[in-house]
Amino acid sequence: MRLVLLGPPGAGKGTQAREINQRLAIPHISTGDMFREAIKRGTPLGRQAEVYIKGGRLVPDEVTIGLVQERLVQPDCRNGFLLDGFPRTVAQAEALDSWLSSRGERLDAVIDIEVPRDALLERLTGRRVCRQCGATYHVRYNPPAVPGKCDACGQDLVQRADDTEATVNKRLDVYNEQTAPLVNYYRQRGLLKEIDGSQAIPAVILAIGRALGRDWQ
């Protein structure tokens, strides 16, 4: 199956992507991982992307799209793929559709994991990280034995700058502004599968399976 995975920060996309990867035996293609691999291998597009990333600039669509195409022709994508982090805009979605069509292919579905904003805020702002060993906790869902202290090494736990309420709200605003047109684009094409991501993790993957016509009991 050829799939796209959408969802805001904190929606649990990584967890669900691993489940989908295992159940459908298709590669999980994260844009971030794809950039890092292309840069590491020193491909022409990877070198172009590196210039923009090192300069703190957005990688242009033509470079990103080229990298995606480069990745999707690899042998492990013969039976499908799960794209995560691409497309981000309608222009990218149109480019992907056009390229797939030129190969006689099309997307099978777009999975949109939806979680209420207050739940996302709780998930993200509650994260704590050990400044010494990097172990991660959550004040509600995975608290340390001693509040504020790492179970592994006893050092202080801190909240990352990315996880403050102001920063999380900004990230969610940017995501919603950027993704709303994309969601509408795929809804109009009958590809969108909206999934309640506020359920327990096992329930979410079962819901994804049902949306794809699979019985993953």
From Swiss-Prot:
GO biological process entries: AMP salvage
Compartments, record wording: Cytoplasm
Catalytic reactions of this protein: AMP + ATP = 2 ADP
Binding annotation for ATP: G10, A11, G12, K13, G14, T15, R127, T136, Y137, Q199
Cellular compartments per GO CC: cytoplasm
The keyword Transferase is assigned to this record: yes
InterPro entries (UniProt xref): Adenyl_kin_sub, Adenylat/UMP-CMP_kin, Adenylat_kinase_CS, Adenylate_kinase_lid-dom, P-loop_NTPase
Entry keyword Kinase: yes
NCBIfam families in alphabetical order: adk, PRK00279.1-2, PRK00279.1-3, PRK14527.1
The protein's name in its UniProt record: Adenylate kinase
Protein's organism: Moorella thermoacetica (strain ATCC 39073 / JCM 9320)
Gene: adk
